[in-house]
Curated annotation (Swiss-Prot):
Family membership noted in the UniProt record: Belongs to the TMEM205 family.
PANTHER family: TRANSMEMBRANE PROTEIN 205
Assigned keywords, A-Z: Membrane, Transmembrane, Transmembrane helix
Localization terms from the record: Membrane
The protein's name: Transmembrane protein 205
Amino acid sequence: MEEGGNPGSLTKVVHLLVLSGAWGMQMWVTFISGFVLFRGLPRHTFGLVQSKLFPFYFHISMGCAFVNLCILASQCSWAQLTFWEASQLFLLLLSLTLATINARWLESRTTAAMWALQTVEKERGLGGEVPGSHQGSDPYHQLRGQDPKYSALRQQFFRYHGLSSLCNLGCLLSNGLHLAGLALALHNL
């Protein structure tokens, strides 16, 4: 730390690089790669790719959030914490919490539910098609109506997937707001 309680240049650079890298990764995974892969790969191949990428993605998000929280927390004067500093710390703590929930709890449950779904689908000859390529009635909708086990597995998968998506969006929003906070605190551009 430099004289006067200001973080050194290296600390500032590391904080900004880790935060912007995490946010960029989150933007890419959330809004680009998932949609491109979903529209271009067979369903089960898409699921396999996601099951390999997401553990790394969530753990990297968790690690980046931890590093950023440690950097910011070490720079704060805790006795004289301002509302602005507290809100920035809260955003990073929220990001760390949500990334940890995804990395350590939701990802494994979502993937297990997906594998169970895919097992039933493979038994029925489904999963090899690219989404949107099927003509006629939806075989997955028919399967839900015919097989209560499949319907229950699908509900379980979408419950975990929905919670994971909410946590991911929370991380993305927290990091984006923290980046905006850093930008607003800049004196020069």
